[in-house]
């Protein structure tokens, strides 16, 4: 049954690329236009919920199916695969490392495209050196206050939900044990989108700076139940 569904979806994606993507891809890439209509169609096709279990509103299909979908999308336009790929990392992190409350709250919306987003990991000064990020989350009586910035974030301006990687223990040894992940919504006070980056290629999909200035989030937005698990969570998601 799942195999048949996978075949049908891959065939549908191939048709979508030929009929909807091919006629507009050159203009969208050249003018760096976010493909909202195409992304909305991807949501209608169920692509944002490919690996999310059915109990949370997804299709519950395999990563093999997802990789085949990436191939078909990339044949038409790599940027569409980028939109889906980053979104899928976000979904994976919440599914595999979030609490049941977090899964029930966010996964149905991630599956149907109500929530779209990505991973706030990279910073301008540290690149992929995760242990040396400078974004800090300080715990208080009501939750966490996050300060810092993220760079090169896919889906940065058009996303509305992100996992933000932050330091929670500046004195941890080794450093990676002082890193935690947090679920941040675009509407959270203190969260904003900075500059959109101009790229030579891989255009259309937005790549942006994210700014967190005294960003207040509740305690239950810590991904999972324990601080200090962020590094291993992110490595698993990637």
Predicted regions and their residues:
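Glycine-rich beta->alpha junctions and the first turn(s) of the following alpha-helix
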Residues: 2-4, 8-9, 75, 192-238
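A short core secondary-structure module
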Residues: 147-193
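N-terminal glycine-rich flavin-associated loop
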Residues: 78, 82-101, 127-130, 140
């Amino acid at each position: 049954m799942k195999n048949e569904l996978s075949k049908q979806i891959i065939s549908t994606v191939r048709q979508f690329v030929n009929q909807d993507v091919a006629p507009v891809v050159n203009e969208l890439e050249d003018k760096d236009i976010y493909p909202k209509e195409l992304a909305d169609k991807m949501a209608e096709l169920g692509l944002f919920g490919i690996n999310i279990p059915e109990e949370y509103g997804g299709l519950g299909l395999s990563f093999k199916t997802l990789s085949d979908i990436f191939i078909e999308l990339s044949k038409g336009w790599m940027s569409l695969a980028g939109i889906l790929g980053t979104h899928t990392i976000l979904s994976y992190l919440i599914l595999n490392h979030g609490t049941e409350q977090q899964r029930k709250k966010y996964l149905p919306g991630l599956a149907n495209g109500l929530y779209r987003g990505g991973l706030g990991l990279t910073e301008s000064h540290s690149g992929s050196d995760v242990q040396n990020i400078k974004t800090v989350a300080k715990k208080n009586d009501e939750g966490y206050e996050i300060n810092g910035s993220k760079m090169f974030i896919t889906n940065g301006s058009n996303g509305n939900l992100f996992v933000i990687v932050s330091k929670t223990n500046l004195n941890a040894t080794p450093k990676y044990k002082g890193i935690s992940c947090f679920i941040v919504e675009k509407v959270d006070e203190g969260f904003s989108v900075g500059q959109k980056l101009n790229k030579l290629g891989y255009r259309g999909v937005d790549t942006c700076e994210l700014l967190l200035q005294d960003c207040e989030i509740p305690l239950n937005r810590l991904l999972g139940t324990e601080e200090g698990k962020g590094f291993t969570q992110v490595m698993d998601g990637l």
